[in-house]
């Protein structure tokens, strides 16, 4: 019986995995899906062979909006009629992720949750209902929520019936990845636990798996991109630096031995974190010790949703795991966390965890314990290497607190309306107005707290980027000052410094793009500041690269590598700017009325006009060769003006030599007052090019429009007057002109006829004829 049931379940699962909508898609082997992992090119399912393929354009990476995900599905599957997207129920392991600008793809897998690209008219999933399981469904026509919300509703409904959620699917789409209901299958706890135990027994011989991170997580995370652009910057920056350290090819053997590969270190940390119990310890003591530990994110920066047992609350709570390190109080699901830790803790905690939670099934549960000082705690804590994780937790606590307060107000509102049924109409309106004002006040307060949280996070990220850039610049200068200087070491330090500057520029552009999407007016206000900051970055890079010419022997040896490095960075910059400035943005609602950056008259050009980016462009005042720089055995030469001829009038801080160079002198760029107050400026050779609107031409256009308007108004008035006169002259009111040559009797007869006189003779003959 059991083998037959297993074969039946396997066949049904295989049929569902290969199931695709039948809207003209006969012959497809797999369902259209896309997967994203920040820092790597997007992947999509090849519907012809059932394998994952990399992004065909070689430029698209993680997308942070559902509209963008839908558009990307339509781009990679142009022959299919993609109408919607929905997050998959289960994560998958995908290998061979490619990085933008790199030819070779890494072989180690990443664990992500893909998005299903729905084809044609929406059709609900066919769920398999095993024996002793129940099929349930919930619909709310007044609710339009995400996949995560309905998954939570299904899980809580099964928990209330003392069952486990076996499978689920969405019902009644109402937007992009939003639905009005869910269908799900609940199975008894005993059978689910048997299935879990059998699966664990096949995969691992140990009695208890403590939820530690596998090596597959060392460099990856689940692909849930739900935050705005600035919330992901720290994770992306640190992951990029880790990958850059892997790809660096140091020429010095000592450095290669000293520097440890990133993934080997994370694998060793993971293996230490997942060490099982020794034979001398009892299982209960170890479980109690593990479940009493605090949640740890770890040194990595992935954002994997996990659960840990909170001793103070007596239940499992969610947190974000970095992907490596941490401790063993780390579980995939809330059910598994409670199964391991709930039975091993004290009886009081056990009773607390076994009490059913009376929650509204259509309300999102609180994802983190809310405290009154949730934001204050984050603001008072100084920033550190775990800034992104701290920001995520603070944001979750803030949202949880806001949801709790809104729920409390709504309950009070319902109770007040129930009590005010018999009150006069004026009193009912007063009650409604009172609670409306209260809700608006809570919304405004939450918005202010969110803004304060984001601004603090942005400031800390900028400070972190500045510290890294300063450290990279100091290492670069130290490498140049070494006696004798090692060219390979100098190049590696220069490469890290250039990347640090590029990270700063990327962060600035990403922040500006986010502000432009959220608040176009504020983006227009900060545009000049962004442009000035980008120009300062290029000035600083020019001055730093000019130091390389003070050591001509090193400059000659690493010429090709530096050209290749700068060309690669320039190509990446072209892609970033093309995506952020030129790429059209699909939006829904009022956001679609926002003007595109490319439609404005202000032109932003952050790159050279000719598209080339090499050391010669950054150093037009020098050419490679030993003859171009006078020899100096002590490496003390006069500093070179690292700017084009048009900018050499700008004052800079003088320096006495390479040995006296300070980081602050290079990072500080002074601008002439006339340059700063000018309405527009233009800088070539990797400088910012900014064309402001011509104020004079605008005034002339306005005057011309005013004169034209006056002329048109005058013509209209004259035309109306003439028409009115013509209308008056055409009215006769029955007056008949009389010839002056007629006799007085005839004139008198005409007047009598005008006054109604009728000749009796004529009247007599008319009556006779009638």
From Swiss-Prot:
UniProt membrane topology term = Single-pass type I membrane protein
Broad class of where this protein is predominantly found: membrane
InterPro entries associated with the record: Amyloid_Cu-bd_sf, Amyloid_glyco, Amyloid_glyco_Abeta, Amyloid_glyco_Abeta_sf, Amyloid_glyco_Cu-bd, Amyloid_glyco_E2_domain, Amyloid_glyco_extra, Amyloid_glyco_heparin-bd
Species lineage: Eukaryota, Metazoa, Chordata, Craniata, Vertebrata
In the record, which residues are listed under signal peptide? 1-17
What's the encoding gene here?
APP
Give the result of residue 144 to S, as annotated: Binds copper. No dimer formation. No copper reducing activity
Q: From start to end residue, where is composition biased (Low complexity)?
A: 268-281
Recorded protein name is: Amyloid-beta precursor protein
- Which residues are exposed on the Extracellular face of the membrane? 18-701
């Amino acid at each position: 019986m059991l083998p037959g049931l297993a074969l039946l379940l396997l066949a049904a699962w295989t049929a569902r995995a290969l199931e695709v909508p039948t809207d003209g898609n006969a012959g497809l082997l797999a369902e259209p899906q896309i997967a994203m992992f920040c820092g790597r090119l997007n992947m999509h399912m090849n519907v012809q062979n059932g394998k994952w393929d990399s992004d065909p354009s070689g430029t698209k990476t993680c997308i942070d909006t559902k509209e963008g995900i839908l558009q990307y599905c339509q781009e990679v599957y142009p022959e299919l009629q993609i109408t919607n997207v929905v997050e998959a129920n289960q994560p998958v392991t995908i290998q061979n992720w490619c990085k933008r600008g790199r030819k070779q793809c890494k072989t180690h897998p990443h664990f992500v949750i893909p998005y299903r690209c729905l084809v044609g008219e929406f059709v609900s999933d066919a769920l398999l209902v095993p024996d002793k399981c129940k099929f349930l469904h919930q619909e709310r026509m007044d609710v339009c929520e995400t996949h995560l919300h309905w998954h939570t509703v299904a899980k809580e409904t099964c928990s209330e019936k003392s069952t486990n959620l076996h499978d689920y699917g969405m019902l009644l789409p109402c937007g992009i990845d939003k639905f009005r209901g869910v269908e799900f299958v609940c199975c008894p706890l005993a059978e689910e636990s048997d299935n879990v135990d059998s699966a664990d027994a096949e995969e691992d011989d140990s009695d208890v798996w403590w939820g530690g991170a596998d090596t597959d997580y060392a460099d990856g995370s689940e692909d849930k991109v739900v935050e705005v652009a600035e919330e992901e910057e720290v994770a992306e920056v640190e992951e990029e630096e880790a990958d850059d350290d892997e790809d660096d090819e140091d020429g010095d053997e000592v450095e290669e031995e000293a520097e440890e590969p990133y993934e080997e270190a994370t694998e060793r940390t993971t293996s230490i974190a997942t060490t099982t119990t020794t034979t001398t310890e009892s299982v209960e003591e170890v479980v109690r010790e593990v479940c009493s530990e605090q949640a740890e994110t770890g040194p990595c920066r992935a954002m994997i949703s996990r659960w840990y047992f909170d001793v103070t609350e007596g239940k499992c709570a969610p947190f974000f795991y970095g992907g490596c390190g941490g401790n063993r109080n780390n579980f995939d699901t809330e059910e598994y966390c409670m199964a391991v830790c709930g039975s091993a803790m004290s009886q009081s905690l056990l009773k607390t965890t076994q009490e059913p939670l009376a929650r509204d099934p259509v309300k999102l549960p609180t994802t983190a314990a809310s405290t009154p000082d949730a934001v204050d705690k984050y603001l008072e804590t100084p920033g550190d290497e775990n800034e992104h994780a701290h920001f995520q937790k603070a944001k979750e606590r803030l949202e949880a607190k806001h949801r709790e307060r809104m729920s409390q107000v709504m309950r009070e509102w319902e109770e007040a309306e129930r009590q005010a049924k018999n009150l006069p109409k004026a009193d009912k309106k007063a009650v409604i107005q009172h609670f409306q004002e209260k809700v608006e006040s809570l919304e405004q307060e939450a918005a202010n707290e969110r803004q304060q949280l984001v601004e603090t996070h942005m400031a800390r990220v900028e400070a972190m980027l500045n510290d890294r850039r300063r450290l990279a610049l100091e290492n670069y200068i130290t490498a140049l000052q070494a006696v004798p200087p090692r060219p390979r070491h100098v190049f590696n330090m220069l490469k890290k410094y250039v990347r640090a500057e590029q990270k700063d520029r990327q962060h600035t552009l990403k922040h500006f793009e986010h502000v432009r999407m959220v608040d176009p007016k504020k983006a227009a206000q900060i545009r000049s500041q962004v442009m000035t900051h980008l120009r300062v970055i290029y000035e600083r890079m020019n001055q730093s690269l000019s130091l390389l010419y003070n050591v001509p022997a090193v400059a000659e040896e690493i010429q090709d590598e530096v050209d290749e490095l700068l060309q690669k960075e320039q190509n990446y910059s072209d892609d970033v700017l093309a995506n952020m400035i030129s790429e059209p943005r699909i939006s829904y609602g009022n956001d679609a009325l926002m003007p595109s950056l490319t439609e404005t008259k202000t032109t932003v050009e952050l790159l050279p006009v000719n598209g080339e980016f090499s050391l010669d462009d950054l150093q037009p005042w020098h050419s490679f060769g030993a003859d171009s720089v006078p020899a100096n055995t002590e490496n003390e030469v006069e500093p070179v003006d690292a700017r084009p001829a048009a900018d050499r009038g700008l004052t800079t801080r003088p320096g006495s030599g390479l040995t006296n160079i300070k980081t602050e002198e290079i990072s500080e760029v002074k601008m002439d007052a006339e340059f700063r107050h000018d309405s527009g400026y233009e800088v070539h050779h990797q400088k910012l090019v900014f064309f402001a609107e011509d104020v004079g031409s605008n005034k002339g256009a306005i005057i011309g429009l005013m004169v034209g308007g006056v002329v048109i108004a005058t013509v209209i008035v004259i035309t109306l007057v003439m028409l009115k006169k013509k209308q008056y002259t055409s009215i006769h009111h029955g007056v008949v002109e009389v010839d002056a040559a007629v006799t007085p009797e005839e004139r008198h007869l005409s007047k009598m006829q005008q006054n109604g006189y009728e000749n009796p003779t004529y009247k007599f003959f008319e009556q006779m004829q009638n």
